[in-house]
Structures are given as C-alpha cells and as structure tokens.
Amino acid sequence: KSTLMKIIAGVEKSYRGEVVWAPGYSVGYLEQEPQMDPDKTVIEVVQEGVQEVMDVLNEYNEISLKFMEPMDDDQMNALIERQGELSEKIEHLGGWEIDAKLERAMDALNCPPPDAKISTLSGGERRRVALCRLLLREPDVLLLDEPTNHLDTESIQWLEAHLRQYKGTVIAVTH
C-alpha cells in the first residue's frame, strides 16, 4: 500500500509504467516518516504549508517599513501602488487571518509548541507537524499514508471532519 502511494506521489521511481496528472494539479503526500529540516522550529515548518501567503505578507511588511525612510513622491507612489496590490492579494488568499488559521490547525492536531525545534520531536510529533503543514497547503490531491498514526482520539475526529469537507481528492491508506 505504501509503495502504491509513493508511486502516485512521484516519490518511487523503480517501477514500470507511468503516472500522469492533468496539468496544474498539485499533489501532497504524507509519508510514514516525514522529512523536515531538523534546525527549523515547528512554526517554521507549518508555515511552509502556506508559503505563498507568508511571502506576500513579508513583502507587505517590508514595504510598510520603507514608508519610514525618506523618499521622493514617485518612490512613495510606487510603494503605495505595490502595497495596494499586495493588500488585494493578501485579501484574496485569506492572509489577514493566517495566524489564526495556523493556530487552529496546530491546536486541532495537538502539535508541539511553535518554538520547539524539529530535532527534539518524537516521531509522532513530527508526523503531526507534517500533517498540519500538508493540510494547510491544500493540494488538489491529498495522499495520506496512515494519517491517524500517533493522533489522539480528538485529533482523529477533527481530521475526519476536515477530510469530509475537503475540496480536493483524498486517498488514504489506513488499517
């Protein structure tokens, strides 16, 4: 079962045949042993799931700081225009509520504290962080290999409810 998931995800290459996805489809895969940068914190890994939003917010904040610097009218107008574009994009992506969304997802999956280093986490804690990151990414196709391993009853119930309303395709391998 796990090998089939790896083939579908494009991780396993030693097989005959091919997996073809329609252009533009995104696929997210929760491995049994998720790979994460051990030097990062929990919140840094979880934020990877919403990287586009984080990048836009960071640029918006950088522009806000530039308003304190001296500049001419043309520079000021360019900054105002760019900040307006970014504000619209943030609104479209739901970026103004991203901190609350991250906190809800992390709480629901009983993730470790946001400032905990990945290198200090148990295997179960790492899986919960990886699952949180993946669900926030919202790929078109979710491939979940034993998604309930290491989850408590409350987290399993939350995950089941979340997957029932998920807008994409969900393929899960469970016992």
Residue positions per predicted region:
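ABC ATP-binding cassette signature C-motif
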Residues: 1-175
